[in-house]
């Protein structure tokens, strides 16, 4: 009879009896051996990870795995590896050449030798730590590691890669286990042999471990899919062959690959509980299930019907439930359930079906050997609380020969429950053979791994990874098949998902998501009564279009995101966790979530995490293999890393702390060296080469958010009197066409203005919420108990060691406002050409100009980012050109005003050196010249009026000469305060007189005929004097200035309203006139009196000048 085969992926059209109703193949001894070995290795590793609670103990000794992979070391040490190769050949119907086999077996046996030698040396060192034993174990470890690195490629030859995949995966596991021990113990080996050069550290081996975890995961997964695709594309392939490859390579390869990430000892220093949620099947394509939430069997109803051959199993109704939702079951019906009788097989909570024995009669019809008939007996073996039970279904027909098939094959008869699988799916169809009146049972059995916990129980001692497919509710059809290395299917979160968990004890946990996304996606997470919103950053860039498949993803496309808040879970209570995607789902914008991780928080965990955080944080400060600081590592970040180092336990990790301290000090030195700011630590404000500040600025120390000093700006009186802090970076420190960046950290601010000034001002306003809650404390205080970015009500003081908001150990996110953290800021400014003579520099100005403003900030730094190019270069060139043109115009305008004012000022003096005023220079002349000086614009910065502007030098040159003229004027005037610039100081005045400002000039003003001011003066009787008065009289009556001496000699200058036509020199102020009078006092004292007879009298100045020889 012609043979008809399945074409994978296409619904079969011609179903031949031989292709479906065949006698199930009895597994070969090779298959039993290799699948058994694979299952045992995976079970051993899962158990080891879950119990790895002591960092000083080896995770898995080589002696534990050796009996599995080399079961007969004396008789045939290569036996199991040969069987792995034979199994690969059988699955893919291909052959490995003898030469390739021999080479591969030689390398695999070589792995055993180097691991054996290493483990002997390791045990000797453990028993007797010394320089000699440490040197030997280091050498043998490195030899073993080098052996794997050199020879693993021999197991991945392109022609034979799929056939050797099982061998490769087992060997990769041995290598990762070896590197895991290197990370654990290398630093201890080095400490025991301090004088040995060129030793690799634990950190070096950790970097290599991460590289090989990723490499092995990606290679094994892609090679598995390569073999699967080869079967799909084969012309003569049955579903059974295809499914056998999936099932057995899942048990040997994918299950083991799913454990590889957890060799990362620094992420999982105290072990982890894992679960494999994938489902493996026996038998037929159309009886397997598509991806869906993980389910549990609660009972099976078996229905019976009678035919000529006797009673038989005619239908099955399964009852299933989602994890944690056992009171809501789903029913699946297969076959005919409306028949003779039924039998219920019930599973109690915690009871699982682990084994089935199925009896079916068989006949030989039309040349078909052992054509199986209907099911008449099933023995279900269940497991609960380490006890096995049997539950039977039996129709008691013995009319035909019977054959019993066991499911699943126990692959070596292991009695350990940790290596078993649980029945998850039992679909059935009844088929009638067309060429004979004969009915046959066709069924499939789905099995899930026993590592899956039915309660989502969270461990109190190690990390717990709970696959999200164990949720009880998910919307929008969002369960998809996993990529192969996750141990099961994934949730594509399109809307929301809910899962139940239960903690084994009252404890705090750090909760993380293991996810992949191709865009930044906001997700809200509710854990019991606690809630948090997170922004998951993209982990890969490929879009989810029609060409995208989950197999396109690599291991590094998945990342962890840890919630910033540790959450306390109650003991033995169900906790509902709800995840909701906050954006509107868009086709192609993918968010895949694999697992939730719960890490218990206790003192040991905290100490270990402090050490791991410090290690990671210190390692990423520097550019690889150099002593250069990474550009995006800020000064604040370094301080926070220093805090992490300080918080390493002295009792437990003194060596590590001593090792990291010089590194962090060196990083701080590099940060200070590249910082162009003077006095960035605010050691001495208003000193030379420091910051300039006014009285509203305070230096603060002891703020728990800052390791060093910070600065505080208080509110301004008004916008004309801001609180300010500024500094100029000298031109000599700058490079042409270069970008510089100002960075810092703001604790909180309101109306804080920042201006970066070179070619005009870059005005920035920072309103930063003061949301970093700080508990009060009293000194002295442990530095590790100073700060917590959130309020911790369980502790009497803040714990700086728990501070994680602003310390990113990966240092891969720039702390600026654009990326979402308002407390950290970074802004850039570009230079064009540089000119040390012009010394344009960069001005950095902070100010508060509002009565409600305030700010506290620190860790300021200005660093060089690098040379400009492209659009940035063109932009700064345009900006500099525009600024230069505008500046030239302003300078030209100022030069004209300068020339006019200078000419006027020159006329004030009697000589070019400015040592003497002209005799006829009046104070009003000086004021008029000063007005011309003040017409010059851009004297001070537009940003802050105390900072020199473009024309400051011109202005100050003229203003200094004006002040010189005033000083000379005051020096020659015998009358003190004769211009009333200081009001009525030095004058004896009646109550009805005052000084008023007339057109910005101070003038004495009388309020009545009896108003009077007077001043007594000392003079030299042998000299003549000139009395010069500038005044104005309004209305009727006269104003007078009288001078008299002790000999009653009286001289008077009289002013009237008719003086405007007087021929004396006129003043700029309307109607003011200047009159003079020569006097020759006969005594050494005189008195000047000013008054009027009626109406109003104004006096601008009174001068008494001694005559020159």
Curated annotation (Swiss-Prot):
Which InterPro entries does this chain map to?
Cry1Ac-like_dom-VII, Cry_V, Galactose-bd-like_sf, Pest_crys_dom-III, Pest_crys_dom_I, Pest_crys_N_sf, Pest_cryst_cen_dom_sf, Pest_cryst_dom_II
Instruction: Return the Pfam families for the record.
Output: Cry1Ac_D5, Cry1Ac_dom-VII, Endotoxin_C, Endotoxin_M, Endotoxin_N
Q: Among its keywords, does the record have Ribosomal protein?
A: no
Keywords noted in UniProt = Sporulation, Toxin, Virulence
- Per the UniProt entry, what is one GO biological process? sporulation resulting in formation of a cellular spore
Q: Example GO molecular function term?
A: toxin activity
List the Gene3D superfamilies. Answer: Galactose-binding domain-like, Pesticidal crystal protein, central domain, Pesticidal crystal protein, N-terminal domain
Superkingdom classification of source: Bacteria
Asked whether the keyword Transmembrane helix is assigned, the reply is no
The protein's role, per its UniProt record = Promotes colloidosmotic lysis by binding to the midgut epithelial cells of insects.
Q: Which family does it belong to?
A: Belongs to the delta endotoxin family.
Comment field (misc)? Toxic segment of the protein is located in the N-terminus.
The molecule here is called: Pesticidal crystal protein Cry28Aa
């Amino acid at each position: 009879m012609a043979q008809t085969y399945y074409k994978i992926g296409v619904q079969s059209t011609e179903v031949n009896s031989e292709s479906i109703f065949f006698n199930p193949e009895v597994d070969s001894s090779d298959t039993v051996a290799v699948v058994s070995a694979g299952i045992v290795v995976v079970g051993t590793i899962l158990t080891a990870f879950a119990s790895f609670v002591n960092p000083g103990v080896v995770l898995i000794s080589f002696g534990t795995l050796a009996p599995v992979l080399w079961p007969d070391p004396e008789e045939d040490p290569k036996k199991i590896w040969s069987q792995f190769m034979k199994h690969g050949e059988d699955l893919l119907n291909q052959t490995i050449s003898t030469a390739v086999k021999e080479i591969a077996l030689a390398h695999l046996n070589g792995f055993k030798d180097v691991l054996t030698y290493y483990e002997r040396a390791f045990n000797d060192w453990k028993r007797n730590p010394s320089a000699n034993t440490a040197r030997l174990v280091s050498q043998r470890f490195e030899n073993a590691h080098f052996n794997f690195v050199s020879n693993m490629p021999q197991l991945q030859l392109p022609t034979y890669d799929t056939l050797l995949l099982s061998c490769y995966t087992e060997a990769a596991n041995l290598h990762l286990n070896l590197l895991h021990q290197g990370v654990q113990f290398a630093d201890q080996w080095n400490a025991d042999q301090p004088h040995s050069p060129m030793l690799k550290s634990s950190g070096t081996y950790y970097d290599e471990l991460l590289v090989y975890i990723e490499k092995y995961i990606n290679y094994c997964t892609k090679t598995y899919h390569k073999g699967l695709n080869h079967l799909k594309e084969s012309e003569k392939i049955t579903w059974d062959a295809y499914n056998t490859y999936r099932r057995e390579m899942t048990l040997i390869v994918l299950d083991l690959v799913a454990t590889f990430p957890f060799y990362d000892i620094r992420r999982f220093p105290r072990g982890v509980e894992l679960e494999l949620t994938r489902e493996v099947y026996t038998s037929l394509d159309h009886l397997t299930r598509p991806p869906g939430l993980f389910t549990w069997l609660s009972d099976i109803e078996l229905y019976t019907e009678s035919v000529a051959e006797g009673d038989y199993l005619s239908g099955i109704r399964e009852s299933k439930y989602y994890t944690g939702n056992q009171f809501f079951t789903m029913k699946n019906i297969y076959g005919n359930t409306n028949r003779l009788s039924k039998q219920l097989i019930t599973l109690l909570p915690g009871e699982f079906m682990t084994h089935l024995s199925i009896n079916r009669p068989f006949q030989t019809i039309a040349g078909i050997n052992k054509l199986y008939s209907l099911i008449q007996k099933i023995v279900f073996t269940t497991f609960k609380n380490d006890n096995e039970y049997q539950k039977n279904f039996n129709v008691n027909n013995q009319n035909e020969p019977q054959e019993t098939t066991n499911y699943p094959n126990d692959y070596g008869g292991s009695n350990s429950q940790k290596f078993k699988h649980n029945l998850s799916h039992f679909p059935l169809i009844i088929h009638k053979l067309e060429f004979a009146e004969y009915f046959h049972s066709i069924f499939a059995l789905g099995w899930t791994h026993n590592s899956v916990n039915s309660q989502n129980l969270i461990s109190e001692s190690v990390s717990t990874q709970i696959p999200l497919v164990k949720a009880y509710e998910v919307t929008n059809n969002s369960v998809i098949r996993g990529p192969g290395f996750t141990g099961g299917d994934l949730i594509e979160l399109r809307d929301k998902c809910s899962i139940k968990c239960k903690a084994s004890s009252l404890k705090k946990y750090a909760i993380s998501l293991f996810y992949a996304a191709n865009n930044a996606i906001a997700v809200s997470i509710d854990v019991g009564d606690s809630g948090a919103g997170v922004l998951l950053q993209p982990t890969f860039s490929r879009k989810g279009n029609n060409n995208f498949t989950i197999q396109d993803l690599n291991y590094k496309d998945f990342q962890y995101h840890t919630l910033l808040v540790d959450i306390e879970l109650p003991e033995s209570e169900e906790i509902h966790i709800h995840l909701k995607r906050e954006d509107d789902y868009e086709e192609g914008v993918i968010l895949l979530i694999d697992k939730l991780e719960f890490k218990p928080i206790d003192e040991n965990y905290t100490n270990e995490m402090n050490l791991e955080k410090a290690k990671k944080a210190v390692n990423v400060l520097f550019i690889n293999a150099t002593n250069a600081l990474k550009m995006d590592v800020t000064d604040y970040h370094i301080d926070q890393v220093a805090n992490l180092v300080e918080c390493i336990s002295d009792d437990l990790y003194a060596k590590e702390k001593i090792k990291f301290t010089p590194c962090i000090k060196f990083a701080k030195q590099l940060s200070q060296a590249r910082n162009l700011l003077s006095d960035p630590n605010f050691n001495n404000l208003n000193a030379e080469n420091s910051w300039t500040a006014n009285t509203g600025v305070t230096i603060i120390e002891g703020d728990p958010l800052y390791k060093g000093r910070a600065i505080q700006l208080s509110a301004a009186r008004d916008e004309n009197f801001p609180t300010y802090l500024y500094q100029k970076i000298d031109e000599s420190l700058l490079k042409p066409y270069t970008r510089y960046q100002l960075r810092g950290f703001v604790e909180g601010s309101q109306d804080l203005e920042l201006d970066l000034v070179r070619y005009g001002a870059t005005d920035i306003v920072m309103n930063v919420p003061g949301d970093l809650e700080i508990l009060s404390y009293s000194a002295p205080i442990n530095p590790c108990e100073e700060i917590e970015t959130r309020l911790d009500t369980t502790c009497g003081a803040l714990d700086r060691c728990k501070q994680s908001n602003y310390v990113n150990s990966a240092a891969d996110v720039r702390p600026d406002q654009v990326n979402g953290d308002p407390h950290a800021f970074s802004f850039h400014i570009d230079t064009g050409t540089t000119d040390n003579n012009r010394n344009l520099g960069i001005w950095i100005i902070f100010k508060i100009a509002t009565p409600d403003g305030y700010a506290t900030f620190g860790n300021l730094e200005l660093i060089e980012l690098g040379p400009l190019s492209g659009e940035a270069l063109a932009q700064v060139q345009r900006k500099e050109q525009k600024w230069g043109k505008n500046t030239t115009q302003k300078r030209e305008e100022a030069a004209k005003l300068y020339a006019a004012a200078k000419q006027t000022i020159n006329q004030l003096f009697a000589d070019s050196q400015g040592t003497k005023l002209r005799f006829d220079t009046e104070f009003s002349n000086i004021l008029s010249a000063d007005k011309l000086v003040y017409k010059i614009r851009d004297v001070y910065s537009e940003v802050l009026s105390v900072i020199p502007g473009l024309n400051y030098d011109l202005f100050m040159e003229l203003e200094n000469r004006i002040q010189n003229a005033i000083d000379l004027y005051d020096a020659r005037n015998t009358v003190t305060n004769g211009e009333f610039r200081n009001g009525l100081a030095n004058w004896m005045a009646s109550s009805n007189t005052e000084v008023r400002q007339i057109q910005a000039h101070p003038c004495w003003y009388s309020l009545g005929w009896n108003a009077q001011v007077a001043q007594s003066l000392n003079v030299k009787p042998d000299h003549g004097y000139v009395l010069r008065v500038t005044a104005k009289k309004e209305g009727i009556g006269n104003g007078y200035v009288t001078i008299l001496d002790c000999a009653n000699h009286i001289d008077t200058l009289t002013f009237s309203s008719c003086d405007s036509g007087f021929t004396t020199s006129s003043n700029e102020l309307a109607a003011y006139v200047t009159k003079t009078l020569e006097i020759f006092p006969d005594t050494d004292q005189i008195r000047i009196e000013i008054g009027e007879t009626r109406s109003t009298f104004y006096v601008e100045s009174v001068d008494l000048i001694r005559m020159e020889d």
